[in-house]
Regions:
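Single conserved hydrophobic/aromatic residue that forms the stacking wall/gate
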Residues: 1-7, 11
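Conserved, helical-rich catalytic subdomain that frames metal- and/or nucleotide-binding sites
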Residues: 194, 205-215
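Active-site metal-coordination/substrate-binding segment of hydrolases
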Residues: 40-111
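Short beta-strand-to-loop junctions in surface cap/lid or active-site-entrance loops
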Residues: 30-39
């Protein structure tokens, strides 16, 4: 809510028409529009204001273990969300300011759209704005710093252009085994052991697809993100 209010205030000072759209209390999406001089196409500059949670605060030594407090170290600014996507938000705001200061008149409308829900699934952000509010644009540029670069060792991760995102799906697999005493594994079918076999198979599973001609398109992949095992109450 604080970030939404700050962005809204900046755009209002820049003379934009600003609207707030809430799907959840105290989490307004911001849409700022500097009107163009004609009936040209609409270009949306899109970004998100929510931040991925911190799960290992003890590793944030650059911020004195306070990941939500921005800390400058040399020419770098460290904080949870500094690149994903506070830095991008700042660039978008400065780009809007530059157009205004230069007195550039566009034939079409620019639309600056800052959403509150991207890290989860977009239900209360872009999806809500398009399906419930009816926000539309002819073209869109999303300042998301995770465009696929092919070789992360070259330091180009997130610094690439991508024409689209392939999307993702979450799949939960449950394996059931046969319970037995720990000294008699020969009499059981251990679901944990079987899951290890499944994971090994998923790691080498081939994907049958045609390589897209669009630059930066993320290739298909499988990522194991969580494993739970055992029965509640067991020692």
């Amino acid at each position: 809510q604080v970030l939404s209010s700050a962005a809204s205030d900046v755009y209002k000072r820049q003379g934009m028409e600003v609207n707030k759209y809430e799907s959840q209390p105290h989490r307004p999406n911001i849409v700022g529009i500097p009107k163009g001089s004609g009936n040209g196409p609409v270009l949306m500059m899109n970004d998100h204001m929510d931040t991925y949670p911190v799960v290992e605060p003890h590793k944030w030594d650059k911020t004195n273990f306070k990941p939500f407090e921005a800390t400058r170290v040399g020419d770098l600014l460290y904080a949870r969300g500094s690149s994903d996507t506070r830095g991008n938000l700042a660039c978008t705001i400065l780009a809007a300011q530059a157009l205004i200061e230069q007195g550039i008149k566009l034939k079409g409308d620019l639309m600056y759209c800052f959403c509150v829900d991207e890290e989860r699934d977009g239900t209360h952000g872009s999806i809500y704005l398009t399906k419930n509010i009816g926000i539309k644009a002819d073209y869109s540029i999303t300042a998301e710093p995770t465009a696929y670069g092919g070789d992360a060792t070259k330091g180009d991760w997130g610094m690439n252009l991508s024409i689209a995102n392939g999307g993702h799906c979450l799949i939960e697999v449950t394996l059931e085994g046969d319970k037995a005493h720990i000294w008699r594994p020969d009499t059981s079918n251990n679901a944990i052991v079987e899951s290890a076999k499944l994971i090994s198979h998923l790691e080498i599973m081939p994907f049958t697809h045609e390589i897209t001609e669009f630059m930066g398109h993320t290739p298909p992949c499988t990522t194991i993100v969580r494993i739970r095992g055992g029965l509640p109450g067991e020692m």
